[in-house]
Structures are given as structure tokens and as C-alpha cells.
């Protein structure tokens, strides 16, 4: 039954690349088979509840621009009735888009209670409402998470807070969110440390806070196993914003943290394009490194404005970048429990309800184009064959012996002298490889 928010709009369908209908897919055909799998099963699209339904359109210089029927009126109180209206519209949008998944924070979906118990009870109540909507629509939960960064209690961190009561409150909040995620058959649970870091070292015990973060994550992993949650625990790296320096800076930093606390086999990473850019990396770099380290899990797909210097969370539209990102994902074997979550929001001037649909349609089409280009590159060995040739020397008997530890430094030095080895540089052929990529996109 329609909420009326989107007007008289039918389910978005695939119309092909020649379509000029803004409310149709041009490249995303969910049933199209690419590399042996349906596009829907490759991409596993999810809609982010927070940007689409909770964000009011504000920025640091101005307040709310969006007028949504589920927002409390000026001076009004947020209620469970409004939360359920929001859910009605959300699931209507998921269905219109044909999006198989959604993601949420606890604070996105229920109003804050007068205390922890009331907040948890409200989360349970909306979870029951979600369960009915999920059964009705077939939409599934990709992941749940706790908002441990917006409320003022978390201004100095959650797991890394100097006050142990805040640590305890955060732990209780995460427990309630994991419980709900499990009840809704969520396939992952995400931890993002927006306030886990510091503004100045003058008031920060960095060593202590690292230990607190390690203990917190260990508690989460222990609880996952205790309750039989089969989903994947994911950490989402980000270098800064809102905190000046965040401890989950990038893939390499998080992997070192996981190794330190013996959790590298228990936790994987949810990697966001915009966060990679903030850390000074490309999206494909972070994906390739996570794959190399065995911790790739899921992605938040969006894009940043390259000139602004902050996390703009725009809908993705750079197909060449996305093709290289999905190439790394296919090289990792594709998504297991993860997927493509649109951690993207409208521009604050995009006021119309249809803008929500159009933003996601464009993002889904761009992802489909990127995935299909990546799949063709994999099938044709367009990049893997030159890469294998570049490193072919390591497949020689001597190359394998050096790498396996069968040669000492003295052995290697003696061979260089005896064989009169004088290596000659070889072209990296970067321009050729870039041109090859352009043939596919």
C-alpha cells in the first residue's frame, strides 16, 4: 500500500541504454547474468536509512531544508508513530527501487528514550515493525549498527571514552543492536568509530584508549559467538571527520589493530570510497589491500567532491573508478556476506521525493556499468595477464628459493657475483594499461 510520499510512481524497471526516462534503469538489469551470476547477486545493493530518511538536509552553515512528513514539527517531539511512518516510506522506496537490502543505525529508526531502557525498548518495537515489512516486501537487512557518535554523551568517544560509564553505555547499546540485527537476520554488523580518536594529545592517553578499543571489540566478537550470530563483524575505516584523528584511519591501520588484539580472523572491513579519498588513497587501493590481507568484507559506495576536502557522500557516477573498484572485488571472489551500500545523500537543494529515487537509480546504473566492465576485464585477462608477465621471474626456481627462505643473504650475494647479475629495467607500461582500461569503460 502506497504511503503517498512518492506519488503515483510504479516500480522502477530496466528499459535499456537508450531510455531517457529518469525513473528507469538503463544499465542495471537485476536478472542479467554476468560472469555466471545475476547482477543483483553480484552487486547486492542496499539503501542507507540514515542519509535517505533521517538526514534533514543541514550543513555546518544552515539547518533543515527537507520537509518530510515523519520529521517532528518545529518544537515537536519525535514519536514511535513518526518512526513507523518513516518505515512505511522507507520500505516503499526499497520496493520501488527493487533494492534487496537496507542498512540502519539504531538512532535512525527510533526516537531517543528518556533513558537507556526506553531507547532499547523502542528499538525492539521498531524491529518488530521492520520484521513485518521485511516479510511483506522480501527486503533483507545487509547490516545493522549503533550510532555511537551523535549524542553528546559520546563527544569524547564511546569505546575510547575516559569515562568507564560511557564505555559501559556504549557496550550495552551495541549489545541491543546486535540482538536486533540477529533477530532481523542481518548478514553483518558494522562498527564505525566516528568519535574514537582525539582532537588534541594534550588530554589524550593514546595507549590507554587503544587498549580500551581492543577490549571493546573483543567483547563484541565474544558476544557474537555466544548468541550464535552468523553474520560478519565489520569495521569501517575513516581517517578523520568528525574527530581530528580517528584510530580506524585506513585499511592498513585497522589491520594492524586487529593483528595486535588477535582479531584478524574474526573481523573484516567495510570500505567506503569517500573515506579512502580522505585518507589519501584511491578506493581501489583500499580494496586491493584488504583483499591482500584477507579482510575484505563489504563496501559503502559513494563519491567525494575532490575539491572540497571533506566527506560529501554524493551518489557515485564515476564509472572508470567504479570499474577498477569492482575489479578488485571480483579478484577477491566477490561479496560473501557484504554488498554495495549506498552511503550517499541528496544535495540539500534536492527537495523533491523523486530526487531520492533518481539518486539511487543513477548510482545503481553506474555500479552496474562498472561491474560489467570489471567482469569483462577479468574474463579477458586484460590486466591479470600483463601483471603475471611482470612478475614472471619470481616463478623461476631461484625466485621461488629466495622467497621461500631457502637462500640466505650470503647465498644471494654470492650468486649475484658468480653469475655477474646486472639487472636491466623493464617498462612498467602504465600508459598501455590505462588505455586498456579505457577500452572497457
Swiss-Prot record:
Record localization: Cytoplasm
Principal location: cytoplasm
The keyword Cytoplasm is assigned to this record: yes
A molecular function GO annotation: magnesium ion binding
Reactions mediated catalytically: alpha-D-xylose = alpha-D-xylulofuranose
Keyword Metal-binding: yes
SUPFAM superfamilies documented for this protein: Xylose isomerase-like (SSF51658)
Keywords: Carbohydrate metabolism, Cytoplasm, Isomerase, Magnesium, Metal-binding, Xylose metabolism
A GO CC term attached to the entry: cytoplasm
Enzyme class: isomerase
Sequence intervals crossing the membrane: none
Binding site for Mg(2+) 1: 236, 272, 300, 343
HAMAP family registered for this protein in UniProt: Xylose_isom_A (MF_00455)
Family statement drawn from the similarity comment of this UniProt entry: Belongs to the xylose isomerase family.
Binding partners and assembly: Homotetramer.
Protein name as catalogued: Xylose isomerase
Organism per entry: Mesorhizobium japonicum (strain LMG 29417 / CECT 9101 / MAFF 303099) (Mesorhizobium loti (strain MAFF 303099))
Amino acid at each position: 500500500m502506497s504511503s503517498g510520499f512518492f506519488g503515483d510512481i510504479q516500480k522502477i524497471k530496466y528499459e535499456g541504454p537508450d531510455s531517457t526516462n529518469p525513473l528507469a534503469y538503463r544499465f542495471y538489469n537485476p536478472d542479467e547474468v554476468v560472469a555466471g551470476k545475476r547482477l543483483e547477486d553480484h552487486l547486492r545493493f542496499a539503501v542507507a536509512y540514515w542519509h535517505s530518511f533521517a538526514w534533514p538536509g543541514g550543513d555546518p552553515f544552515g539547518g533543515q531544508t527537507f520537509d518530510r512528513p515523519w520529521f517532528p514539527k518545529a518544537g515537536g517531539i519525535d514519536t514511535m508513530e513518526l518512526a513507523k511512518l518513516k518505515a512505511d516510506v522507507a520500505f516503499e522506496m526499497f520496493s520501488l527501487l527493487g533494492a534487496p537490502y537496507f542498512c540502519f543505525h539504531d538512532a535512525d529508526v527510533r526516537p531517543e528514550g528518556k533513558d537507556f531502557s526506553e531507547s532499547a525498548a523502542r528499538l525492539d518495537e521498531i524491529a518488530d515493525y521492520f520484521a513485518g515489512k521485511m516479510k511483506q516486501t522480501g527486503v533483507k537487512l545487509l547490516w545493522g549498527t549503533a550510532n555511537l557518535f551523535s549524542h553528546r554523551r559520546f563527544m569524547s568517544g564511546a569505546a575510547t571514552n575516559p569515562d568507564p560509564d560511557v564505555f559501559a553505555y556504549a557496550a550495552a547499546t551495541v549489545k541491543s543492536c546486535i540482538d536486533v540485527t540477529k533477530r532481523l537476520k542481518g548478514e553483518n554488523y558494522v562498527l564505525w568509530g566516528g568519535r574514537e580518536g582525539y582532537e588534541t594529545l594534550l588530554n589524550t592517553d593514546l595507549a590507554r584508549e587503544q587498549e580500551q578499543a581492543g577490549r571493546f571489540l573483543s567483547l563484541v566478537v565474544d558476544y557474537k559467538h555466544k548468541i550464535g550470530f552468523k553474520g560478519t563483524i565489520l569495521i569501517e575505516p575513516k581517517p578523520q571527520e568528525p574527530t581530528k584523528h580517528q584510530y580506524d584511519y585506513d585499511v592498513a591501520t585497522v589491520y594492524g589493530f586487529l593483528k595486535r588484539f588477535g582479531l584478524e580472523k574474526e573481523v573484516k572491513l567495510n570500505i567506503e570510497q569517500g573515506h579512502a579519498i580522505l585518507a589519501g588513497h584511491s578506493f581501489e587501493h583500499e580494496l586491493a589491500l584488504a583483499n591482500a590481507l584477507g579482510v575484505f568484507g563489504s563496501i559503502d559506495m559513494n563519491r567525494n567532491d575532490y575539491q572540497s576536502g571533506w566527506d560529501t557522500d554524493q551518489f557515485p557516477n564515476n564509472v572508470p573508478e567504479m570499474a577498477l573498484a569492482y575489479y578488485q572485488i571480483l579478484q577477491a571472489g566477490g561479496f560473501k556476506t557484504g554488498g554495495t551500500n549506498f552511503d550517499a545523500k541528496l544535495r540539500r537543494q534536492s527537495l523533491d521525493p523523486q530526487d531520492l529515487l533518481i539518486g539511487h537509480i543513477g548510482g545503481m546504473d553506474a555500479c552496474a556499468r562498472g561491474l560489467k566492465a570489471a567482469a569483462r576485464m577479468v574474463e579477458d585477462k586484460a590486466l591479470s595477464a600483463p601483471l603475471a608477465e611482470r612478475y614472471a621471474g619470481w616463478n623461476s626456481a631461484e625466485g621461488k628459493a629466495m622467497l621461500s627462505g631457502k637462500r640466505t643473504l650470503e647465498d644471494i650475494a654470492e650468486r649475484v657475483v658468480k653469475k655477474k647479475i646486472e639487472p636491466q629495467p623493464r617498462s612498467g607500461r602504465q600508459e598501455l594499461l590505462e588505455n586498456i582500461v579505457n577500452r572497457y569503460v
